[in-house]
Amino acid sequence: MIIDGIEYKLIPGLMDYYVSKQGLVYSARRDRILKGHPDRKGYLNIYPMIGHNKKKTMRVHRAVALAWIPNPDNKPEVHHKDEDKTNNSVDNLAWVLLKKM
């Protein structure tokens, strides 16, 4: 899907939610880009609807990785290469075995 010249992919496991390589999240249900909200650890979260009145918390960096970064070894964590938790660009993310501290 292309919106304003930016390519988006469906976030696996979420209907009607798409994410760009830059970390922008689009809700087809609401027809708008969602704003990420920082949690107490500094990660940006979105709150997609997964049912009639149910919301799910999802970190934006995980949505980017699920949609854009292959994970053939089924690694569980997504790491920010530059340690900036708000830089959710696909080029800044990597699947890892354990979260690097």
Predicted features by range, described:
Residues 1-78, 82-101:
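Conserved recognition-core residues within compact binding domains
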